[in-house]
A protein has these predicted regions:
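Cofactor-binding loops of NAD(P)H-dependent oxidoreductases
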Residues: 24, 145-147
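N-terminal, positively charged regions that mediate nucleic acid binding
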Residues: 150
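A short, charged, Gly/Pro-tolerant segment at domain boundaries
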Residues: 173-175
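Conserved G1/Walker A P-loop phosphate-binding module
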Residues: 1-60, 64-76, 80, 157-161, ...
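Conserved C-terminal guanine-recognition region of P-loop GTPase G domains, centered on the G4
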Residues: 36-43, 64-144, 154, 158-171
Length: 175
């Protein structure tokens, strides 16, 4: 996601990781890792990657360093701010993120992913519905959460857990 999309707030809500969280861009300067437990005995590692900016594939905003970390992941969550105060329109934000990934390395866009609308507790209904409709139209997996209030968080964790298990099973059958 872009800076201030709620990435650090989400990792703090779903794991024991305690990244610095503040209301200004680029609070996260290095990736934060957190172990997420779900179910009785299952878990997966999440990475809070510093925010992408337009031109990241050209090195803007430390883009190369951040994009290399994304390359190591097996499943992506595109976090999109749908709050009243979001600086970007949500569909434009998502499309810019996908463009940056494709421009850095086309194979990144073939990774399984889901779109996550964030900041539901202070949402703009118009922005939320625009992103939801876009995802429905393109058949992209879509979730909406508030990490601050935990609305939708448990459902998202279960969904990601199932996706990670599916990726792991695919890797096991290929070896």
């Amino acid at each position: 996601g872009f800076p201030n999309a709620g990435k650090s707030t989400l990792i703090a809500a779903i794991s024991a990781a305690r990244p610095k969280i503040a209301d200004y861009p680029f609070t996260t300067l290095v990736p934060n890792l957190g172990m997420v437990r779900w179910g009785e005995d299952r878990g997966f590692v999440v990475a809070d990657i510093p925010g992408l900016v337009t031109g990241a594939h050209e090195g803007k905003g430390l883009g190369f360093q951040f994009l290399r970390h994304i390359d190591r992941t097996s499943f992506l969550l595109h976090l999109v701010d749908v709050s009243l105060w979001a600086t970007e329109e949500p569909v434009s934000s998502f499309e810019t993120m996908r463009h940056e990934l494709a421009s850095f390395d086309e194979s990144m866009t073939s990774k399984p992913f889901a779109v996550v609308a964030t900041k539901l507790d202070i949402r703009s209904e118009e922005r939320l519905e625009a992103l939801r409709a876009y995802c429905r139209r393109h058949q992209f997996p879509f979730h909406a959460i508030s990490a601050a209030t935990r609305e939708g968080v448990d459902e998202l964790v279960a969904y990601v857990g199932r996706q990670v298990e599916s990726v792991r099973q695919g890797c096991a059958t290929q070896s």
